[in-house]
Curated annotation (Swiss-Prot):
Keyword Hydrolase: yes
Pfam families named in the record: SpoOE-like (PF09388)
Name the UniProt record assigns to this protein: Aspartyl-phosphate phosphatase YnzD
Function description: Aspartyl-phosphate phosphatase which specifically dephosphorylates the sporulation transcription factor Spo0A-P and negatively regulates the sporulation initiation pathway in order to control the proper timing of sporulation.
């Protein structure tokens, strides 16, 4: 996934997660699912950054 697109997806998922937390609470099933999806996106982003840094050296 292109870095800029990934950042947009992360921001979109964060906003969605915030709305779900406010509506359903921190421990609801949907909140946990969305949080895990956000975690996955963040891990993808970190891997891309690490590859970019390693490639620059």
């Amino acid at each position: 996934m292109i870095r800029e697109h990934l950042l947009k997806e992360i921001e979109k998922k964060r906003a969605e997660l915030l709305q779900i937390v406010m509506a359903n609470g921190m421990t609801s099933h949907i909140t946990i699912e969305l949080s895990q999806e956000l975690d996955h996106l963040l891990i993808q982003y970190q891997k891309q950054r690490l590859r970019a840094v390693a490639g620059d050296e």
